[in-house]
Regions:
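Composition-driven recognition of glycine/serine/threonine/acidic- and proline-rich low-complexity segments
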Residues: 1-226
Length: 226
């Protein structure tokens, strides 16, 4: 499979497949394709894994697209202004995505639910208990909100992140919450009560404009009908 990511604010990934090659995606993610791409809808692992995908923000059923009789082309566009990033997934090198980030992947990549190990990170971290775990072997594409900044964390090195800006991280990273120090800072600082701490080793990808922040910014301008 060869691919090209086009566009900046509203990107799309265009994939060129050899005959017989397959890609998986959630329902409704396909933007355009060549006529020889054959679609099959499947639970892809049974009802248990389908329910897990639903918990992680994706649809229960996935579509498998296969290039029939020759080379095929299929494109997947981002659903929100932001970035599409490719990730090379290998056995034992899983990735953790924010909820609903998974866009598409080569057949052989598996999407499942990832529960945060520490209750505090789920209760106060701002994104809930559930994220997405991507495993297997192949290239996976994820869509993130705004631009993406990547950091390589050494063992024990930590970065503190405001709620919602965590886009993805290596499964080797550890996630926890940190309380904002001082009651005055909590009440008047405008940053909330808690931040998320990510500790290496591993890589972390941060997004500049979480969709939740966009929603909060435009909410005061939405007519209420009164």
């Amino acid at each position: 499979m060869k691919y090209q990511i086009l566009g900046e604010t509203l990107p799309v990934v265009v994939c060129q497949l050899e005959a017989g090659e397959k890609m998986i995606t959630e329902g409704g993610a396909m933007s355009w394709m060549s006529p020889n791409m054959q679609m099959e809808t499947t639970s892809n692992g049974g009802i248990g894994k389908a329910l897990g995908r639903a918990l992680s923000g994706e649809k229960m059923f996935q579509n498998i697209y296969t290039a029939q009789g020759g080379e095929g082309m299929i494109a997947f566009a981002s659903s929100f202004p932001g970035s599409i990033r490719p990730f090379q997934i290998t056995p034992g090198e899983d990735m953790i995505f924010q909820k609903s980030a998974f866009l598409a992947a080569e057949f052989g990549v598996e999407l499942s639910v990832h529960f945060r190990k520490k209750i505090g990170a789920g209760l106060f971290g701002g994104e809930g208990f559930i994220m997405q775990r991507v495993s297997g072997n192949g290239i996976a594409f994820a869509e993130f909100d705004g631009h993406v900044v990547e950091y390589e964390l050494q063992p024990g090195q930590q970065i503190v992140i405001d709620t919602g800006h965590l886009a993805a991280m290596s499964s080797s990273c550890n996630m926890d919450i940190q309380s904002v120090p001082g009651m005055k800072n909590k009440l008047l600082g405008g940053e909330g009560f808690f931040n998320t701490g990510i500790t290496g080793p591993g890589r972390v990808w941060l997004q500049t404009m979480p969709i939740s922040n966009v929603a909060g910014a435009i909410r005061p301008y939405i007519p209420t009908g009164n």
